[in-house]
Amino acid sequence: VRQVVGLRNPGHSVVKLMNPCAGPAVVVTAYTHPEYLDMLHATFTSMGMTALLSRGLEGEVATDPRRTPRYDAFLAGQHRLLEEQQPGTAAEVPGLPTEIDVATTAEYTRQVLAGALPVPPALARQVEHILQLAAQIS
């Protein structure tokens, strides 16, 4: 499907909606194409889901450490805009490597988790949003 219409197949979108938890949970998901915002908004609302939805890079849920995306929260299906997308890309993120290979990315991640490098502000903000939503369902 991607080669023909330029989008992933519908299965990719369905997987992003899955909640593997038996109890209350925050579904964290993202979209790339603007038309998916309306579809996901309607889905989360009609299903009464609790979710954090962001405008992702290639639809990936982990935010780009150089950008602050739009964040929409859904608490039991009720929508709230948390944050508008901030314009531009950070010129520099302390410690963020320019290489994007697996080994470099893994080493960078290890250093951030160990506290040797700072958590990028954009990622810290995403975690804050997740924790705030999770606190409302526990």
Residue ranges and their predicted role:
Residues V1-S138:
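Glycine-rich anion-binding loops and their surrounding alpha/beta cores
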